[in-house]
């Protein structure tokens, strides 16, 4: 997680506590999903993220440490059909992840200080982008998947003024994504195979 979300929420009385509240909400949401490890980056301010060299380096370091074959991230592209997909922080993180995956994470000459720290180059095989203007990959969700997603999102109490509305939006989105494929529910992505 790049920021602690300290500029999010709508309750101004909680402004001083917002960063820690949002971190706690993220921890609980990840527990609901069975996430084994949650990493928070430090030094990036909510609402002010840009795909800087420092952010790319931090993502490269994480990629080299974890060595994933697949990364899920947000699209760096504008999606004019959905205002929610266009948060500038989300697009900036998507751009930084893209630059980190190729070429930096696999290039031994990129960020030599990481190599000196024992973080060897790594090739991420696929990146799945969510929220972009186009999709080319669908993952079927069963009812348990949808319920887990709803429970996780409901942990973000300070993020959403109307959690029931958000739950309905999640359920409807899963249904809409699944319908053309004969699924009760689905999640759509743009899938980028980085192997060529």
Q: Language-model segments: which ranges?
A:
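Active-site rim/loop-helix segments in enzyme catalytic domains that contact anionic ligands
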Residues: 1-67
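Metal-dependent de-N-acetylase/amidase catalytic core
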Residues: 51-196
